[in-house]
Amino acid sequence: MLPAKMVTTAFELPGYRVSANLGVVRGITVRSRSLVGNFFGGLQSLFGGNITIYTSLCERARSETYAEMCQHAQALGADAVIGMRYDATEVMTGLTEVLCYGTAVKLEPLAGREPNP
């Protein structure tokens, strides 16, 4: 997987210049909660606050899509992903699509500057 420092929501990386744009890369997953999970999530919502069952589901979905996006970038020979974003859409009741996307790029160190580690 690409090092975390080489994936950014910014459109540039300090100490580097983009030498080639390899295109959009993405990871996608569609998730649903089990009937039991929905029941306990519903109970938690009665008391307010953080709904931990859904929080952990969302975090797993984001982690999976991030890893898939990074694998896609590596398959293209990318050095980094810039402009990374997440998006989530309810496909139908109980099913949520999570998308992680960005632009895969090749980088060159800037002349006379040490790249930011």
Curated annotation (Swiss-Prot):
Top-level taxon of origin: Bacteria
A Pfam family annotated for this UniProt entry: YbjQ_1
Annotated InterPro entries: UPF0145_dom_sf (IPR035439), UPF0145_YbjQ-like (IPR002765)
Similarity annotation: Belongs to the UPF0145 family.
Official protein name in the record: UPF0145 protein CV_4322
Species assigned in the record: Chromobacterium violaceum (strain ATCC 12472 / DSM 30191 / JCM 1249 / CCUG 213 / NBRC 12614 / NCIMB 9131 / NCTC 9757 / MK)
